[in-house]
Design a protein with these regions (language model features):
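Domain-edge interaction signal
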Residues: 1-235
Length: 235
């Protein structure tokens, strides 16, 4: 974050927190909809998987999920323009994760990131030693709480973005891994090399006081540009 930028931390709302937990569960292969009991869970395996993810890695993937979903939303909105009577629709993941700011390592959803150390922030996870770990107590109730607080539209948006990205690879790396399997460093590199008018403008020149989400609201064409630059990084 640019030195001197005001930092107004607010508590993260339940819907956003639950959506983030659903997103994390999706990444590590924990299917909450199947509602497995603790006995059926391989907790050690899941925690080993969780240990591979820094919060920076989550933030970059979350941003890429939001861009992928926004591309779908733009397409759907164009179709709705042809069908004006169809007005009930979800605004997409960028309306849920609506507080991205430009940090040193790329876009960060501030409400999630800055509250991660708060006890009780997450239902399914604790945050220990820089990593999320699965809570073992009352797992079924906690899983159901996440599902109840994450709308079906948001679940579908996360599922859809996951399905689209799981077979996408990064052009900058020849290792053949899906973008979802890449480590933190290449994800940060991608985030730094999207539209020059988004993260660089917000981070280095304090555009919109570093608030990427606000930038997208005020200059919608920059969201389109960011999506196109992200798509150009994939194969």
């Amino acid at each position: 974050m640019v030195k001197g930028r005001s930092k107004e931390l607010k508590m993260c709302n339940l819907e956003k927190t639950a959506a983030f937990e659903y997103f994390v569960s999706k990444l590590v292969g924990l299917d909450l909809k199947k509602s497995p009991s603790v006995k059926e869970l391989d907790v050690e395996k899941l925690n080993n998987k969780l240990s591979e993810y820094s919060m920076t890695r989550y933030m970059k993937l979350l941003y890429f999920f939001c861009l992928t979903d926004a591309k779908r939303e733009i397409y759907n909105n164009r179709r709705r323009a042809e069908l004006p009577e169809e007005t009930d629709h979800n605004g997409g993941l960028l309306e849920i994760f609506n507080n991205f700011e430009a940090y040193l390592n790329g876009p960060v959803e501030v409400d999630i990131y800055e509250n991660r150390l708060n006890k009780g922030m997450f239902s399914l996870f604790t945050f220990e030693d820089g990593r999320l770990e699965l809570r073992k107590d009352e797992f079924l109730n906690r899983a159901q709480k996440v599902l109840d607080e994450t709308s079906s539209a948001v679940q579908d948006a996360i599922d859809g973005a996951y399905s689209e990205l799981e077979n996408k690879k990064l052009k900058i790396l020849p290792n053949g891994k899906s973008i979802l399997e890449q480590d933190t460093t290449p994800l940060v590199e991608v985030a730094h090399n999207l539209s020059p008018n988004v993260w660089p403008a917000c981070f280095y020149y304090n555009k919109e006081k570093g608030k990427i989400s606000q930038l997208f609201k005020n200059e919608r064409e920059l969201l389109h540009s960011e999506i196109q630059k992200f798509e150009s990084q994939l194969k």
